[in-house]
Amino acid sequence: MASFQTLPEAVAALVHDGDTLALEGFTHLIPFAAGHEIIRQRRRGLTLIRMTPDLIYDQMIGCGCARKLVFSWGGNPGVGSLYRLRDAVENGWPNALEIEEHSHAAMANAYAAGASGMPSAFFRGYRGVELPEVNPQIRFVECPFTGETLACVPAHRPDVAVIHAQRADRQGNVLLEGIVGVQKEAVLAARRSLVTVEEVVDDLGARSPNAVVLPSWTVSAIAVVPDGARPSYAHGYYARDNSFYVQWDEIARDRDRFTRWIEEHVLA
């Protein structure tokens, strides 16, 4: 059952050096505040999983939190590249980073398999592409019923899943709505989970048709962190700070400027 904790308490209890960690949220509800707390607590040796690693993983990688990244597509959405990710891969700064690249379909299916307690995911994909040549985790099997060739990847079973949501009720049930990515699957696949929320309410209230409610028993800890997804957006609460994404392109290009920004805005 979910317990209500402060963000520093929850990260200290749930996220350990060497863990496999998934911070999920698709275009919005990206758990920036939680990622910054992980940086402040100086976690090291993490394997980071994310469908679309963007600024928060760029920051965590640049701060030396990660040893490996499992992902599909990485970039600064609508702007360009992730220069801290590139520096780690190309130059080993601040440390070497192993990468394992998949398609979006593979990542989503791997989360779904993990959430179902399955060891691997089977799906139609990777036909006529070269990614399987550089990723040995992508295999192909023959369906025993149809003879069709299917792609196969290991299930994602992170030690910890971290997401941001709009609200939780006082019983620890969590509501997220708007564009829903793989947050539900990531939480269900993980051994432990942390949800940051904008607010706690008596009743979750009216919800949109595509809303997801995570029952309390699926969540390890809830931390109330208003604005916890900024500079991404939280549907119904605040808009995306597009100007910051543009600014990050310049900040992240230079190691010294990046380090100063982290010291001033995350570690201070």
Where are these regions (language model features)?
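Conserved alpha/beta enzyme-core scaffold
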Residues: M1-A268
